[in-house]
């Protein structure tokens, strides 16, 4: 009898312990559902898929089916995009320079690269007016203007390096692209770093392309997302990428319409859009070549003293499942 009572007592005690333990376990709270998705709208230098999306309202319509509203802050600066991402006022950097993504990650911003937006070495150019400047070697001692710490700046350094020159061989002045073109055309600079439609503008005014990124830099633009969004709602990121692919498919299948949208949005003529469009590869899959290009971009940033903390580039990339 006593043995039965003892056994019963132990059973009750075990049950109480188990129940208490279960009650004591804290379940991780589920992340709140996404109600508003903030995606940058960047049309330059010639971001045709984004322009298609704006005209067709693809993201708005598709996410609307899930009762998610989409807003489009127009932030062109890569640094400002990643600042907004860090502050939580942005979820997706739709078209972010590889330089900006790497710098942000090295400074602790929780950004993940989930795809490639474009590769366009032909779209990023060093332009000049002086007929005596025939190669990058002729830029020695000259004033070169353009945006610092960007793909364009990287192309300049790579072009100089190819000629056996260090970055210090030129007088580099940081200027935005439109201002740089104006400086060149007004003889306030010997060369300007120019991308997209501004290349055609400069050429029309008498400037010419000295060289572009071909054989130097792939000019990789990435799709960056908040690490928090990816961790808590991978399905939203997956859907975003699928919708982005819809825009690319539309561009490929309805080329005349896509080019028409782009001409209207950028102020270019239809013929000019047709000249520039082949410069761009909008395939989103991250390849080994892309990884190598991003690693070389990091080498550039470190060498120029613009990046202090080296990162593992592969840790910046994320596969969306």
Question: Predicted regions: what is each one?
Answer:
Residues 36-55, 149:
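Extracytoplasmic "Venus flytrap"
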Residues 32-37, 62-74, 89-91, 162-174, ...:
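A local structural motif
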Residues 1-36, 321:
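Short, low-complexity disordered leader/linker segments with a strong preference
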Residues 232-306:
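Secondary-structure end/capping motifs
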Residues 30-31, 128-143, 231-235:
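Flexible hinge/capping segments at coil-to-helix
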Residues 51-68, 153-172, 203-204, 260:
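Ligand-binding cleft/hinge of the Venus flytrap
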Residues 99, 169-173, 178-262:
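Pocket-lining segment of extracytoplasmic ligand-binding domains
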Residues 47-53, 73-110, 122-136, 154, ...:
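Pocket-flanking alpha-helical
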């Amino acid at each position: 009898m006593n043995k039965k009572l003892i056994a019963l007592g132990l059973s009750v005690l075990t049950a109480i312990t188990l129940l208490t333990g279960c009650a004591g376990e804290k379940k991780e709270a589920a992340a709140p559902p996404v109600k508003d998705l903030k995606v940058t709208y960047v049309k330059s230098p010639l971001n045709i898929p984004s322009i298609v999306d704006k005209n067709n309202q693809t993201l708005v319509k598709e996410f609307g089916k899930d009762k998610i509203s989409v807003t489009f802050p127009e932030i062109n600066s890569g640094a400002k995009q990643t600042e907004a991402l860090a502050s939580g006022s942005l979820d997706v950097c739709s078209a972010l320079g590889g330089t900006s993504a790497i710098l942000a990650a090295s400074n602790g911003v929780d950004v993940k690269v989930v795809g490639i937006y474009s590769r366009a070495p032909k779209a990023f150019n060093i332009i000049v007016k002086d007929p005596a400047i025939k190669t990058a070697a002729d830029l020695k001692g000259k004033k070169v203007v353009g945006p610092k710490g960007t793909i364009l700046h990287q192309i300049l350094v790579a072009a100089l390096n190819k000629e056996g020159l260090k970055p210090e061989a030129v007088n580099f002045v940081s200027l935005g692209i439109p201002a740089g073109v104006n400086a060149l055309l007004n003889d306030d600079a010997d060369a300007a770093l120019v991308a997209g439609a501004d290349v055609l503008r400069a050429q029309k005014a008498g400037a010419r392309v000295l060289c572009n990124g071909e054989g130097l830099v792939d000019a990789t633009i990435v799709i960056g997302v908040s690490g928090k969004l990816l961790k808590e709602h991978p399905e939203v990121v997956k859907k975003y990428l699928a919708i982005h692919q819809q825009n690319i498919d539309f561009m490929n299948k309805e080329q005349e319409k896509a080019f028409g949208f782009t001409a209207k949005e950028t102020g270019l003529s239809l013929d000019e859009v047709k000249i520039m469009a082949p410069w761009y590869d909008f395939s989103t899959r991250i390849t080994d070549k892309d990884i190598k290009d991003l690693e070389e971009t990091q080498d550039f940033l470190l060498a120029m003293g613009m990046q202090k903390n080296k990162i593992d580039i592969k840790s910046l990339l994320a596969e969306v499942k």
